[in-house]
Amino acid sequence: MNLPANTALFTPSWHAELELGYGRFDDCTRPTQRRHKGPLRVQKHLYAEGPQVCQHIIVHPPGGIAGGDRLDISATVGADAWAQLTSPGAAKWYRAASPAFQQLELHVQPGATLEWLPQETIVFSNAQAELTTRIELHGDAKLCYWDVVALGRPASGERFEQGHFQSHLDIRRDGTLLWHERQRIIGGDGLLDSPIGLDGKTVFATLLLTGEVSSDLLEACRSLSMPNPVRGDLTQLPGLVVARCLADEALHARAWLIQIWKYLRPALLGRQAVTPRIWNT
């Protein structure tokens, strides 16, 4: 069969969108908005902790992000609602000749809580990953946000020798900046092995929790046994607790973050931690 010259045999890149919303109805958090375009969606909402906390698992069926792809995710948590968003597995950014993009917009209304707890991001050598995250908190809204990034695939003998990983994160409360961070990591750069950079570690992770805790609780978190060899620490900033670590494997970094999350969640968010089942599959 002869096809016209202008017939596309495949789509070279994806532009996917996901828009989520949550509201509080009586004593239950329910989805109020769920719109998707392209290969980005959520599974059925879950209530592992009871009706107050609505859990959604964000799924990207292609399994990886390639050059030219763009993922746009937005979520709004209405007043007094509680949403927990996670993922079924690692997000993979493949080697590519052109950049790929992810834009994340999160809005949390007064009295509401949002937990953004995806599994790790794996950035292949020669990938060109560019991520932008903007989080707006209103009134006394609460946030738990983490990010685990693995550069290259050391288990397969692949170092992050070429390409780049670029990340931009802003968190504001009622328009006032709480956290601003820009990262640009170049494949093969000397900072990957430098003591003032990643010091030879291939995984770095950050946990951000709104609120303030006692010095005793911070010390208790610091004294937790770490998966070897993880190097991590915590800092109390005005209105924000920051936990960061370096590791050789994403599994170890995530295990450390989960420990910190279990310790801090009751104090800062007001509920005991319940590990999502999807993390164990």
Curated annotation (Swiss-Prot):
Subunit annotation: UreD, UreF and UreG form a complex that acts as a GTP-hydrolysis-dependent molecular chaperone, activating the urease apoprotein by helping to assemble the nickel containing metallocenter of UreC. The UreE protein probably delivers the nickel.
Organism in which the protein naturally occurs: Pseudomonas savastanoi pv. phaseolicola (strain 1448A / Race 6)
GO cellular component terms listed in the entry, alphabetical order: cytoplasm
Name of the protein described by the UniProt record: Urease accessory protein UreD
InterPro entries the UniProt entry points to: UreD
GO-annotated molecular function: nickel cation binding
Annotated gene: ureD
Stored HAMAP family: UreD
Role noted for this protein: Required for maturation of urease via the functional incorporation of the urease nickel metallocenter.
